[in-house]
UniProtKB/Swiss-Prot annotation:
Name the UniProt record assigns to this protein: Cobyric acid synthase
Active site per UniProt: 333 (nucleophile), 435
Alphabetical UniProt keywords: Cobalamin biosynthesis, Glutamine amidotransferase
GO biological process, one term: cobalamin biosynthetic process
Gene: cobQ
Pathway annotation: Cofactor biosynthesis; adenosylcobalamin biosynthesis
Similarity remark: Belongs to the CobB/CobQ family. CobQ subfamily.
Function: Catalyzes amidations at positions B, D, E, and G on adenosylcobyrinic A,C-diamide. NH(2) groups are provided by glutamine, and one molecule of ATP is hydrogenolyzed for each amidation.
Domain of life: Bacteria
Single GO term (MF): catalytic activity
Amino acid sequence: MAMKSIMVVGTTSHAGKSLISTAICRILSRRGWRVAPFKGQNMALNAYVTANGGEIGYAQAVQAWAAGVVPWVEMNPILLKPQGDMTSQVIIRGRPVGRVNAADYYEQYFEPGWRAIEESLQHLATEFDLVVCEGAGSPAEINLKHRDLTNMRVAKYLNAPTLLVVDIDRGGAFAHVVGTLELLDPEERQLIKGVVINKFRGQRSLLDPGIKWLEERTGIPVVGVIPYLQEVFPAEDSLDLLERKTHKAHADLQITVVRLPRIANFTDFDPLESEPTVAVKYISPKQDLGHPDAVILPGTKTTIADLILLQKTGMAEAIQNYAASGGTVLGICGGYQILGQMIADPEGIEGQAGRYQGLNLLPIRTVITGQKIARQRQVSSNFPQQGLPVNGFEIHQGRSRVEPQGDSQAFQPLFDDVNLGLVDSCQSVWGSYLHGLFDNGPWRRAWLNRLRQQRGLKSLPTGVANYREQREQMLDNIATEVENHLDLTPFLP
């Protein structure tokens, strides 16, 4: 296909493909290119809703913002959202098309998936100067290569000069590079135009003998040695939550997020982590809840299964007791549903059909349906401060109904749309369907100020920018750092 492109693959998962791809998008955008990110197939529970209501991986949305363009579904034509029991929801060009187990996925979706990839690339070619493609995992998985929709099949289709990224932080980098190249077909290996050594810590001169050997051994230049930057870049995989730092020396507030097994859109909490006076801690449902300033139940792809786990581990009771003692609890999306009175799944969308009792902290009843809601929203807040503009997006299959209350003032709509969330009269129990809630700077600060007041702390200014401005600065910083250590000359026409 005649389209200018760069492919980024990695020797392993977590090599840093997303970071490098994102940085290249911003670097080339700053040089005047009209760039589109692309990932043929992504498996992730962090999703974003485009303007036309389609779902893509959140990482591709970040890459689009890095490129200075609006996210499109064509930038991630296949999104797989794991649901447990070795099954995933399959989303093609933004729309859910089915649920399938791993064994049957390629049998049912390989051909339509590749057509969606081809059509998406052809569409992007009409609108952009260059596409930056990101692979997944490793391009040299022998048992998967014949049905790989994401790595070298895309590179060959585009005849794309390809970067091979390796993580040196965990050790074994040289073996990973040589082994990967040995396992590629000659046609694939010919496309590898440079190696990037990522996550390097230490003195560069100590690495030079290894680089010299690698270049002589493979005949491929090392075009970049990138310092360790992962701490300033949002993680895509929930496993990375285990490695996040939870301690801040000067944190005034401690917020605990329950790390549900199928936690989704934990990017919702990046803005909280960016607050200098807030420490965010992720705990498993089996850990002690402790006494934080607030507890958050995040989104989840398997609401009922995670609700049952919370009940089995005692975390559900711990949260109920915490709320009864005056603690602040917030549920987002699936977490909001869990805080309600009941969740019903009559069609067995999430697994076994049935009705399940929630934590009964909010007066809502939820029914899981086959029709997913995915849309961007612009609303106005009622709490914690009246009239604040709030932007975000919904992604959920449940329909929640607010139950009538004897005391009409006991619970109030959180926004000017009652269907988007509730808060109790004490402003202790909150629930919302809105992802990206904390991205809204004034709303985030107003919510945090309520927690600060409970601690007797001075309120912080609420006239702050939305998180997207911090994200833009982060993307600029990452791009500048990568550009200082990466030679893109062999990859540009």
